[in-house]
Curated annotation (Swiss-Prot):
Its EC number is 7.-.-.-. It is a multi-pass membrane protein. Coiled coil: none annotated. It holds the Pfam family Rnf-Nqr. NCBIfam families: PRK12405.1 (NF009070), rnfE (TIGR01948). It comes from Buchnera aphidicola subsp. Schizaphis graminum (strain Sg). GO terms for biological process: electron transport chain. It is found in: Cell inner membrane. Disulfide bonds: none annotated. InterPro entries: NqrDE/RnfAE, RnfE. This is Ion-translocating oxidoreductase complex subunit E. Keywords: Cell inner membrane, Cell membrane, Electron transport, Membrane, Translocase, Transmembrane, Transmembrane helix, Transport.
Amino acid sequence: MEFKKFFKKRLWNNNSSLVQLLGLCPILAMTTNTINAIGLGITTTFVLTITNSIISILKNFIPKDIRIPIYMIIVSSTVTCIEMLLHAYQFNLYQSLGVFIPLIVTNCIVVGRADCIAYKSSFVISFLDGMSIGLGSTFAMFVIGSIREILGNGTFLFGANKIFNVLDHSFFFTFIDKNSTIILAMLPSGGFLVLGFVIAFKNYLDLGKKNCLKCFHSCKLKK
């Protein structure tokens, strides 16, 4: 197994958020702030990695006909344990993420990877798949959250002490004056716009400038 290709495929080429467009509800809801985006991304990564690993270990004992309900039991148990840990050790982050922690149970990425990969692959592949898919989703959330926070609030990493307890609550960067911010970026519609621009920029990087211009001109001629 070539680890570079393995991770590149999941982190970039087939990114669950920017290519497959899965799990968009929590992404759009929690990316108004970079720290919340990172927090939800890391939490989702842990859930993906742990559930993939458990299902891979138990795959020979899971009946094929009832595998989906069993996945849901494993995922919900994992999410509940992580939620309790956040409540105990990262209470500020727990409060910020709120209902979106238990909603990870319904995230189609988690059950999708469990059925497509963990149920059919070895422990190592399942573990690495869960981790890489989670990190890819975290990367997308971080980029979208950073753009929305800078444009809509004028700050970057505001509330970093929620994750990094060693930092002071005043640790953050200011890029834009409060009076010059774009409030649209903090609204759901702004979230969709930023997501669209990020996807377009990724496609531009993947396809290259020439292919994008060709596509643009061909669309123009058709009109």
